[in-house]
Amino acid sequence: IVLSFIDGETNITVNGEDVSKEIRSFEVNSNVSEISCIEGVRKILVKKQQEMGKNGGVVMEGRDITTVVYPNADVKIFLTAGIDERAERRAKEFSEKGTDVPIDKVKENLKNRDFIDSNREASPLKKAPDSIEVDTSNTTIEEQVKLILDQVKIIADKKRN
């Protein structure tokens, strides 16, 4: 497994094959929680993620980034949104990539993932106590970016002083 950055995007190759698009498919999304429960898989992925950011200056998203992968990160943001909003966004994402998935199916998938990921033993989905929660339910992407950048600036200013 090789993770690389090309034109601001994360590219993932497995045994030399680019799987960057496939990894975000509905089929993978429907099965990812079952695989992520396997402790050996978690250990390998956490190690890879930690290697990516060993020199700092990295922004990562994931369900255990602030609690397991980078528990000492300078800035920890915990994004939330209502299930209906999340389902709508994910269905739109799939549609833009050429796969139409009914919203009710996407919503059920998200609920299932949330339950499995929140209750797994290895690297469960939970909010780090020192993370900043940002509810994105009723905000545009531009507003979300501004909210997060404002928090980054506040933390950076505190570190300088």
What are these regions (language model features)?
Residues 1-2, 33, 37, 54, ...:
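Generic surface-pattern signal
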Residues 1-12:
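Translation machinery proteins
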Residues 4-6, 49-55, 63, 68, ...:
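Small-molecule kinase domains that catalyze NTP-dependent phosphoryl transfer to phosphate-bearing small molecules
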Residues 20-29, 36-97:
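ATP-dependent NMP and nucleoside kinases share a basic, alpha-helical "lid"
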